[in-house]
Amino acid sequence: MRHLLALLMLAAGPTFAQTEDTPEQTPAINVVSGNPAAVNIDAGTGQLGELIGLTPDTGFRLGGVLLADFNWLVTGGKEPGKTGWNFLFILGGNVDLDKTIGLPGAEVGSQFLLYKGYDVNGQAGSVLGYNSLEASPPLGRTELYQLWWRQALLDDRLTIRVGKSVPTIDFTNVLAPIPVENEPFPVPSLSGLIYTPAFVNPTTEGAMPGYYDSAWGVTLNITPIEQFYVNWGIYDGSLASGFTTGDHAFPHFNGTYFMIAEMGGTWKLGEDELLGRAGFGGWQQTGNLTNGTITEDGTYGFYGFAAQTIWQETGHADESGQGIIGFFQWGINDSETMPFNGFMGAGATAFGVIPSRPNDTIGVGAAYGWLNPNNFQRDHELMLQTYYQAQVFDNLFVQPVVTYIKDPGASPSYSDAWALSFRVTVLF
């Protein structure tokens, strides 16, 4: 059950999630994120590097992830019967500068991203987005996804990361766990849901950089005690004015900024010490934001999330553990131009429910967004999603996904939609 419990540690992001592997340790994999590019700072498991001799003791890490899915809009939406596919490839490497050149607490990292796909969310008329691999246009990208320097200070209680990165990894990230007791979990998640609200709070969408529009900026993390953290970040804010920050390799500071801060912590409930965690944050976007004839001078918002172990079963030393974890999200903003003004979401994941398949998971999720009346004629969109994620072998996972979209928000003329997806994830 130790692996299941580790999935519920602080979601303070990668700034203090960099645990050191030893030659005796083997990266453990439990549930894999429906979109690892959105919630994990390290690409894949690092086994690609080990194949060419880059073992953890060398200070070098090379890994990657490949995702591909097929989607069928069975009925409803904008284009019922339509199909589409998505393909994502990420290759990344890190260098521990302490091990390589003797610079304590320093690390550099970089990732390359290749994406190609279809407007499957547009086919369904979904503003929330039932498939997180499809983000904003263009729908074909080759880009420098990340390039950063991370410096740990004060016994890792303060870390600073400077460069091009993905803020949704550090902020609003309800799904990302943190390793405990020096156990490496390179690509775990609290859920395998694939819909977009699981990875970016809809009330920040259009302003907050993330997958796949990463941005240049600075991220600070403070962890005075193990059970509490504070994160703060400031980034290039030109995404809100329509500039695609992800597919531009160099900084593009035009006087607008996206600033965000988050604090959170963990707890244990009852005799079984059921782990839970929660976070709360606020953000501000500067600059003139426009939508048609409407203009506003910046905007701001608040969000929160929580996760709790609901049930766990111990005594399965040969398995990853059995249990159920639930999570909750919310967000609001004061924007006149962004797509959503409010959001609530929740979900649950069952781990190891089939004794002979300890690394399979079953999950459900619900997302409800209040649409900005300046942008849409409908005032809301509701999405329900369920999946079964199966580990075929080692680092290969497959998952069928069923999504129901009630009142697709793009147009009041679109009827309720049903979509089927089949995703394959390969980690290396």
Question: Residue ranges of each PLM-predicted region?
Answer:
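N-terminal periplasmic/intermembrane-space "pro-region" immediately following the signal or transit peptide
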Residues: 13-69, 73, 96, 101-102
